[in-house]
Swiss-Prot record:
GO terms for molecular function: DNA binding. This is Non-histone chromosomal protein 6. Belongs to the NHP6 family. GO terms for biological process: DNA repair. The gene is NHP6. The keyword DNA-binding applies.
Length: 92
């Protein structure tokens, strides 16, 4: 094999029954505000939408972020619970 060639590694297939990962506070914010940003800026690219959402998130005060952080905490607890149940089910 030539020194510039890379070995192909096969990725482990994801189990469709595995619990979905928890969302971060930013992701809850982005999901809630994505359509608003698109409506305010028609015709912008997907990347630009993300950039504007990031700027809006950074501009929020810590108090404004609290509802999103609470949602993220709740979702994290859900994920941990589902992950434990999934691990218990698949260990047997």
């Amino acid at each position: 094999m030539a020194p510039t060639e890379k070995k192909r590694t096969t990725r482990k297939k994801k189990d469709p029954d595995a619990p979905k990962r928890s969302l971060s506070a930013y992701m809850f914010f982005a999901n809630e505000n994505r359509d608003i940003v698109r409506a305010e800026n028609p015709g912008i690219s997907f990347g630009q939408v993300g950039k504007l959402l990031g700027e809006k998130w950074k501009a929020l005060t810590p108090e404004d972020k609290i509802p999103y952080e609470n949602k993220a905490d709740t979702d994290k607890k859900r994920y941990e619970k589902e992950k434990a149940e999934y691990a218990k089910k698949n260990a047997a």
